[in-house]
Design a protein with these regions (language model features):
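Short secondary-structure boundary segments
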Residues: 101-102, 123
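Conserved active-site segments centered on acidic
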Residues: 2-94, 102-114, 192-202
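Phosphate-binding/catalytic loops
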Residues: 2-9, 109-202
């Protein structure tokens, strides 16, 4: 089993690029997404740092037992995860922010209004990524994020309900499995997109 150590730096941003996943409590959705993406990036690039936080998280808790159990099916150990509350420093450091729902997007923009342009729903990135210019045709990672934002048509309310990831907290293990399967698929595509974008900047 791959053991991912969820150690936090005192200052986020040691990697060249910082990707941030955001949910509510930072106990299931965002840490699962963080783990999936970290797992996939291990063999592709070392230039990306992946973190997660919750808009209403209580600090220093662990992932839910259901999340830990489900991730074992993917050979990922989530037992070392520690919850973190979303804050200004974390938002400012992130080049790309992936929110689970539209209310999470709103919470992020309240912390830093400029972050709105680089914040997307989890399903939205995959959907828009297929619509914009090929990454290899763009000059930088930043320009790719800008293209993603432009593809939304300039609307302040982004994404669709189908782009959101439902909260499995206090629900059945089956619901956790459904969320995990979807996040795994999204992170698979996101890994390919990010790797191409980062390699473009190398």
């Amino acid at each position: 089993m791959l053991l991912l150590r969820f150690q936090r730096y005192k200052e986020i941003g040691y990697g060249l690029y910082v990707i941030l996943f955001v949910c509510t409590g930072n106990t299931c959705r965002s840490p699962m997404a963080e783990a999936f993406l970290k797992n996939k990036l291990v063999t592709t690039t070392s230039e990306i740092e992946v973190f997660s936080a919750g808009t209403n998280a209580k600090s220093n808790l662990g992932a839910t037992k259901e999340a830990i159990k489900v991730m074992e099916n993917f050979d990922i150990d989530l037992s070392n995860h520690t919850t973190h509350l979303l804050n200004k420093q974390t938002v400012e450091k992130a080049e790309l922010i992936v929110a689970m729902t539209r209310p999470h997007e709103l919470s992020i923009s309240k912390i830093q209004q400029q972050a709105r342009n680089r914040t997307f729903l989890a399903g939205e990135i995959v959907r828009l990524g297929s619509l914009i210019s090929k990454i290899e045709e763009l000059p930088s990672f930043k320009s790719w994020v800008e293209e993603l934002h432009s593809a939304r048509g300039g609307h302040m309310t982004s994404g669709r309900s189908g782009d959101e990831i439902s909260d499995p907290f206090d629900k059945s293990l089956d619901e956790y499995e459904k969320v995990a399967m979807r996040l795994n698929g999204i992170c698979e595509v996101l890994c390919k997109l990010l790797t191409s974008a980062v390699n473009k900047n190398s």
